[in-house]
């Protein structure tokens, strides 16, 4: 079968499988590509191909992730699946694979297990917006009441982590049986089609970066004689137009200025948008009033903060991280967007220390404020060497 051309006209949604080891995440991923393929919406990717996922580096951390894609009538999906539990944690914390929604796989034979909980908690912490449940291995449970009990248990667990457990879709099926299908009309294929329909209707289409308020991390500052000060960087979100007011946020007191020019590849433009590497000319701003590490943003859209809570993954020794644990009072650099800022870490009560390879909750107070919102990713460094990665989960001050 020739590779089907993907229609880029459909909305694009990033999704992934989460759940306990051996509950069937990878089998389900393969089954989705098979059934979608049989329905004429993509190419089948076999279990073994997904399972031997290549390793990628994100913020200096090695993560094994498999990427597959498929379509429904309504959407184009990019789907991530990780072979190992540690890969999931790293993936969710670093945001290596951004998830607009997740498929939580729970084996009906086991019910929710420790990693089920951990993945739900992480999804909540890192802000995965929606979860759809696939209750797998239902062919191995004869008792209808038992299936109902497991479903109830999963719903209650999701509710306890502030997901709408009573309302979200739970699909019962068998990924293995679906993999044996030769046609999308077979009974065993129906749960997979139902799951895709549930993803279409329940997982919300993400707001496109270009529709969000303007933000550009400042990478460099130049002064151009007779014209003023130019800041350069890659526009993270939104659009900047000539003549618009912007704020310079972070490190120092927030300052207001006006964009008097946008240029890209030495050409003058009337606007810059998400994804563009641009130079922005600022009216009346002096070269020494702005620095790398600050951001240029739409007025009032983002504020500077010094105290926050974060979920962090600490690199193991094998990953080039620390060789020894650290304790409350640890003072590394936090690398946000384009710059390092020193901060002091306080661990949660009852947590004595954090070992290399652990994930933990940090309470951080930084010496300078940084423009931040929950969901912002950062690296933790010691003398320029990455020793961890994290995501802001809550602003404290």
Swiss-Prot record:
Domain tr-type G: 10-207
Main localization category: cytoplasm
Family matches, as InterPro entries: EF-Tu_GTP-bd, EF-Tu_GTPase, EFTu-like_2, EFTU_2, G_TR_CS, P-loop_NTPase, Small_GTP-bd, T_Tr_GTP-bd_dom
Cellular compartments per GO CC: cytosol
Superkingdom of the organism of origin: Bacteria
Region (G5): 174-176
Binding site for GTP: 19-26, 81-85, 136-139
Region listing for G4, in residue ranges: 136-139
CDD domains: EF_Tu (cd01884), EFTU_II (cd03697), EFTU_III (cd03707)
Stretch list, region G1: 19-26
UniProt KW keywords: Cytoplasm, Elongation factor, GTP-binding, Hydrolase, Magnesium, Metal-binding, Nucleotide-binding, Protein biosynthesis
Localization of this protein: Cytoplasm
Spans annotated as G3: 81-84
Catalysed reactions listed for this entry: GTP + H2O = GDP + phosphate + H(+)
PROSITE patterns: G_TR_1 (PS00301), G_TR_2 (PS51722)
Broad class of enzyme this protein falls into: hydrolase
GO MF term list: GTP binding; GTPase activity; translation elongation factor activity
Subunit structure: Monomer.
Function according to Swiss-Prot or TrEMBL: GTP hydrolase that promotes the GTP-dependent binding of aminoacyl-tRNA to the A-site of ribosomes during protein biosynthesis.
Family note: Belongs to the TRAFAC class translation factor GTPase superfamily. Classic translation factor GTPase family. EF-Tu/EF-1A subfamily.
Name used for this protein in its record: Elongation factor Tu
């Amino acid at each position: 079968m020739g590779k089907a051309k993907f229609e880029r006209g459909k909305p694009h949604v990033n999704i992934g499988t989460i759940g306990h080891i051996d509950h069937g995440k990878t089998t389900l991923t393969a089954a989705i590509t098979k059934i979608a393929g049989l329905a004429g919406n993509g190419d089948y990717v076999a279990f073994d191909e997904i399972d031997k996922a290549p390793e990628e580096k994100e913020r200096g951390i090695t993560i094994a992730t498999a990427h597959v894609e498929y379509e429904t009538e309504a959407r184009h999906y990019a789907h991530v699946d990780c072979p190992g539990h540690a890969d999931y944690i790293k993936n969710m914390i670093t945001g290596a694979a951004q998830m607009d929604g997740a498929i939580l796989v729970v084996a009906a034979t086991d019910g929710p297990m420790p990693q089920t909980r951990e993945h739900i908690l992480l999804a909540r912490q890192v802000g995965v917006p929606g979860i759809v449940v696939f209750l797998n291995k239902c062919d191995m449970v004869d008792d209808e009441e038992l299936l109902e009990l497991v479903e109830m248990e999963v719903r209650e667990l999701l509710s306890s982590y502030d997901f709408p457990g009573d309302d979200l879709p739970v699909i019962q099926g068998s990924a293995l049986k679906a993999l044996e299908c030769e046609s999308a009309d077979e009974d065993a294929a129906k749960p997979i089609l139902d799951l895709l329909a549930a993803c279409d209707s329940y997982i919300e289409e993400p707001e496109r970066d270009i529709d969000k308020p303007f933000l550009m991390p400042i990478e460099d500052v130049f002064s151009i004689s007779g014209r003023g000060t130019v800041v350069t960087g890659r526009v993270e979100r939104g659009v900047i137009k000539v003549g618009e007011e912007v704020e310079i946020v972070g490190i120092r007191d927030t300052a207001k200025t006006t964009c008097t020019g946008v240029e890209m590849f030495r050409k003058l433009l009337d606007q810059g948008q998400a994804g563009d590497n641009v130079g922005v000319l600022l009216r009346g701003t002096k070269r020494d009033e702005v620095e790398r590490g600050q951001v240029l943003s739409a007025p009032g859209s983002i504020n500077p903060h010094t105290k926050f809570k974060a979920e962090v993954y600490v690199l193991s020794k094998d990953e080039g991280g620390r060789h020894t644990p650290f304790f409350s009072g640890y003072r590394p650099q936090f690398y946000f967007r384009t710059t390092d800022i020193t901060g002091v870490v306080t661990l949660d009560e009852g947590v004595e220390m954090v070992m290399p390879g652990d994930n933990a909750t940090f309470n951080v107070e930084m010496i300078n404020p940084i423009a931040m919102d929950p969901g912002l990713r950062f690296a933790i460094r010691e003398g320029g060497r990455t020793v961890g990665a994290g995501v802001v989960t809550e602003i404290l001050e």
